[in-house]
């Protein structure tokens, strides 16, 4: 019997109780704000939506005043938010329950390690596997930080619901506190008044480390080692999870990312992790009251204690406390040295004898900062060894062991920061350098072969650099060189791992990679033997993915590249872009091209003796590579995951997965288990069968690509339809990220960034990028020969890639609503533009019918009852928001709203994104 996924659906009765209570409180608060008469409008709207009487609903909404719209749109935005919290709480409860009762579930790490332990290479896999979630600042998180903080309080209160029901805590006081926070949310601005700055994005993402990720990653790694040990596998220093980050280093299309933001990103990280260590050591200081009159520490602990400036008479016989105090003192100095900030939380409130900081002894014996995390860990190891010498192994478990584990994982920063820039920017900078050095006057006009010859010659000219103080530089070149210089300084200061990769957006040639090498060489990050920053191509469009094999084969053939890769443990990372390939060719073409590219690139790596590792640039929606993480990883081509995989975690997905430590632990556990299972499990053993599957997919995808591009790029009215029948203009003005919605002025679909493209299709409920072109392509294949439907059904049952592909379409279709989409189509001014909707509608119906036929299902989401139930409970609420949004857009475009009222549209955008739970 297959294992089930952990889902909150097992607690539907509790969720129903919680939602009823939350709804009752929100209704009372709203009624008090607007009065009984106005609240009857909300009640009538709700009834019409539940009955799906959309014609009457449209009429009622059209008669609501702008003033009434504000509270009504807030009500219907906050209600799905509260439902989300209830579901998240009960998922966390389910996770804890299943773990504490030792129940098996899909992706459980204990099962994965147990299955692996019996294999000959089991220990090697466990030692080497490394999954890297990379948190990005992509503008899809529509919630303000203030709102997220309030929802965190509500989440904590709902965690106590069962205790309140049982009388373990005072029910009335619990209800009052819950009511208070809901009232605060209802009266707090949902929408940001100003656009986020990069520094805000850095600060915002740090709350996830502070609140959940540090603890979850540390606990999971400790458990990982313990589980391996249980099966006789002693692991040295495994890192099954390490974290990555783009915020502060991703300047592709974002002019606000600079050398200063890169430095700030690393510095804030360092501050957060050092504060964590200081807090944890303060707790250990309070706990370790062991007296030397009862148990004698070893000489190293005595040495640490003797260096402490905690000279309190009450600590004379407590060497462990004094040793921890000394370690804390050194951490404080380390924080000052690395961040130029004092230890923010190092105070008497966490148990320290703060008077010791200014004691005379501190002048005679100055405390020195740690040179590296290795030195910090050595002091902790000394305490551990002393405890072991005295037979106190039980005292090591828990806080001390987890702090030591955290040091191994994080060191003095939390996540490796990626740099990213568009290839065209690098080409412009290199062209300027070559011209300024009188080497090539017009580099951009050279052929690809000529470019590579020039670049390789310069890379071999050591230690010569191209830039000169005597030659004036453009602002762009100055800015780029400043960023690379800062990267080198941060690596020297915090360690090599703080910045390991530089990603090249829109990689189209080998010269794109050598151009980056030239820029890195200018600041000393690349020479003939070594690349301190790995050059990572990002292949994004269908054409670039098709060409990726030849590009990488040519790149890997160069001796200098082999030297660079050798210094990186023989790994070459390649990033795959899901968003642009989807916008370029549609869902099927994107998914299949990415699948084939991984197979081809893996083979090229093997030919050159290089381990190709993949970085998956996935978004929250299916149209941007989203979907269940476990299924996404286990459906990758067999052999494409060697031992390392990186994937982006973006926008609202970060909050959904890492908003609390229990759910964070579970999602990280899923990532590790999925990666290990894909590394060792080949689902289809018959090579002839997989070859036939590929032939079928090639045929279907070719048709799908043609169908998709015929509408998106060949239909002269499609551009106007998208811009008039979706809230793309309003989305672009929403203050949800520091980056512009487009790299340049938008005059065609290709110029629009993938995120607002997908976001807007989600808002008008068509979900176009996640399914268009699927139905017609499959229908053509089915109609070609008898038995083709049965072949597709067999593929769905036996091929994880195909199963995941269709399950994602199923999910997207379930969130779409063609009745609502029709109303958005009426926003278009001309009939020929509005008629585009009917092409979309025909394809939607065909896609739904074909998907159900291949799955052999009667209804959508038959395999996903949890999501089906969740959507059923929330759809009536955010369907209302769509009708409100349509009415507000009409008024805005007809100048019936003033500028202050534009935020009403933004409120509906927020609410719809909240209800869908994956916006971009």
Swiss-Prot record:
The enzyme's E.C. designation: 4.1.1.31
Pfam families from the UniProt entry: PEPcase
Keyword Transit peptide tagged: no
Magnesium listed as a keyword: yes
Keyword line: Carbon dioxide fixation, Lyase, Magnesium
Cofactor(s) it depends on: Mg(2+)
Gene3D superfamilies for the chain: Phosphoenolpyruvate/pyruvate domain
Annotated GO CC locations: cytosol
GO biological process: carbon fixation; oxaloacetate metabolic process; tricarboxylic acid cycle
GO molecular-function terms, A-Z: magnesium ion binding; phosphoenolpyruvate carboxylase activity
Function: Forms oxaloacetate, a four-carbon dicarboxylic acid source for the tricarboxylic acid cycle.
NCBIfam families on file: PRK00009.1
Family, per entry: Belongs to the PEPCase type 1 family.
Name recorded for this polypeptide: Phosphoenolpyruvate carboxylase
Organism for this UniProt entry: Streptococcus pyogenes serotype M1
Origin organism lineage: Bacteria, Bacillati, Bacillota, Bacilli, Lactobacillales
């Amino acid at each position: 019997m297959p294992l089930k996924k952990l889902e909150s659906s097992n607690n539907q009765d509790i969720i129903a109780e919680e939602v009823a209570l939350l709804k009752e409180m929100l209704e009372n608060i709203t009624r008090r704000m607007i009065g009984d008469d106005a609240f009857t409008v909300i009640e009538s709207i709700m009834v019409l939506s539940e009955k799906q009487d959309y014609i009457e609903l449209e009429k009622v909404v059209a008669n609501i005043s702008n003033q009434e719209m504000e509270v009504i749109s807030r009500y219907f935005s906050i209600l799905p938010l509260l439902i989300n919290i209830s579901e998240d709480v009960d998922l966390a409860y389910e996770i804890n329950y299943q773990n504490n009762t030792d129940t098996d579930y899909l992706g459980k790490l204990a099962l994965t390690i147990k299955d692996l332990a019996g294999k000959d290479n089991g220990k090697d896999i466990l030692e080497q596997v490394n999954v890297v979630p990379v948190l990005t600042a992509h503008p899809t998180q529509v919630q303000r930080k203030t709102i997220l903080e309030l929802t965190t309080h509500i989440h904590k209160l709902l965690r106590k619901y069962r205790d309140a029901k049982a009388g373990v805590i005072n029910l009335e006081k619990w209800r009052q506190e819950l009511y208070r926070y809901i009232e605060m949310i209802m009266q707090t601005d949902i929408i940001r008044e100003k656009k986020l700055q990069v520094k805000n994005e850095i600060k915002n993402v740090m709350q996830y480390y502070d609140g959940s990720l540090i603890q979850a990653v540390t606990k999971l790694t400790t458990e990982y080692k313990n589980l391996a040990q249980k099966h006789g596998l002693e692991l040295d220093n495994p890192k099954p999870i390490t974290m990555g980050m783009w915020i502060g280093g991703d300047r592709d299309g974002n002019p606000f990312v600079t050398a200063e933001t890169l430095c700030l990103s690393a510095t804030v990280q360092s501050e957060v992790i050092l504060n964590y260590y200081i807090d944890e050591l303060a707790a250990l200081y309070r706990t370790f009251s062991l007296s030397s009159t009862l148990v004698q520490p070893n000489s190293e602990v005595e040495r640490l204690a003797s260096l402490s400036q905690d000279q309190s008479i009450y600590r004379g016989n407590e060497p462990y406390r004094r040793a921890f105090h000394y370690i804390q003192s050194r951490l404080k100095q380390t924080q000052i040295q690395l961040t130029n900030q004092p230890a923010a939380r190092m105070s008497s409130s966490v148990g320290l004898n703060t008077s010791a900081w200014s004691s005379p002894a501190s002048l005679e014996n100055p405390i020195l900062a740690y040179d590296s995390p290795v030195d910090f860990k050595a002091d902790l190891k000394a305490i551990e060894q002393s405890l072991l010498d005295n037979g106190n192994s039980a005292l090591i478990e828990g806080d001390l062991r987890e702090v030591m584990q955290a040091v191994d994982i994080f060191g003095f920063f939390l996540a490796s920061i990626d740099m990213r820039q568009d290839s065209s920017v690098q080409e412009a900078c290199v062209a300027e350098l070559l011209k300024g050095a009188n080497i090539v006057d017009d580099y951009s006009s050279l052929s690809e072969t000529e470019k590579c010859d020039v670049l390789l010659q310069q890379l071999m000219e050591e230690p010569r650099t191209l830039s000169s103080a005597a030659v004036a530089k453009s602002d762009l070149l100055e800015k780029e060189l400043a960023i690379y210089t800062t990267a080198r300084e941060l690596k020297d200061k915090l360690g090599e791992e703080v910045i390991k990769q530089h990603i090249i957006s829109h990689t189209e040639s080998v010269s794109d990679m050598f151009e980056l090498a030239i820029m890195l060489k200018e600041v000393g990050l690349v020479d003939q033997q070594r690349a301190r920053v790995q050059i990572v191509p990002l292949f994004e469009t269908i054409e670039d993915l098709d060409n990726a094999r030849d590009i990488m084969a040519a790149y890997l053939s160069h001796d200098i590249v082999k030297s660079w890769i050798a210094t990186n443990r023989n790994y070459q990372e390649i990033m795959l872009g899901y968003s642009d390939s989807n916008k370029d060719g549609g869902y099927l073409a994107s998914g299949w091209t990415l699948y084939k590219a991984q197979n081809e690139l893996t083979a090229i790596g093997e030919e050159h003796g290089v381990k190709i590792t993949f970085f998956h640039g996935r978004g929250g929606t299916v149209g941007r590579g989203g979907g269940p993480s476990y299924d996404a990883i286990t459906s990758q081509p067999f052999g494409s995951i060697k031992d390392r995989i990186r994937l982006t975690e973006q926008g609202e997905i970060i909050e959904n997965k890492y908003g609390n430590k229990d759910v964070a632990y579970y999602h990280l556990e899923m990532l590790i288990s999925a990666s290990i299972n894909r590394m060792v499990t080949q689902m289809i053993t018959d090579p002839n069968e997989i070859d036939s599957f590929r032939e079928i997919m090639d045929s279907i995808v070719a048709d799908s690509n043609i169908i998709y591009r015929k509408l998106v790029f060949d239909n002269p009215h499609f551009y106007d339809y998208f811009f008039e029948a979706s809230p793309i203009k309003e989305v672009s003005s929403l203050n949800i990220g520091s980056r512009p919605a487009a790299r340049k002025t938008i005059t065609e679909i290709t110029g629009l960034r993938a995120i607002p493209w997908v976001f807007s299709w989600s808002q008008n409920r068509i979900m176009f990028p996640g399914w268009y072109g699927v139905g017609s392509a499959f229908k053509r294949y089915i109609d070609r020969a008898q038995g083709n439907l049965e072949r597709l059904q067999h593929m769905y049952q036996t091929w994880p890639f195909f199963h995941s592909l269709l399950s994602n379409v199923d999910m997207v279709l379930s969130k779409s609503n063609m009745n609502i989409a029709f109303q958005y189509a009426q926003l278009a001014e001309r009939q020929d533009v509005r008629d585009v909707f009917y092409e979309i509608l025909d394809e939607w119906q065909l896609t739904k019918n074909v998907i159900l036929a291949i799955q052999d299902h009667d209804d959508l989401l038959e395999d996903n009852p949890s999501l089906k139930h969740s959507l059923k409970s929330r759809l009536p609420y955010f369907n209302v928001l769509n009708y409100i949004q349509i009415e507000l857009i009409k008024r805005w475009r007809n100048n019936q709203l003033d500028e202050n009222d534009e935020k009403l549209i933004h409120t509906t955008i927020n609410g719809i994104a909240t209800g869908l739970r994956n916006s971009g």
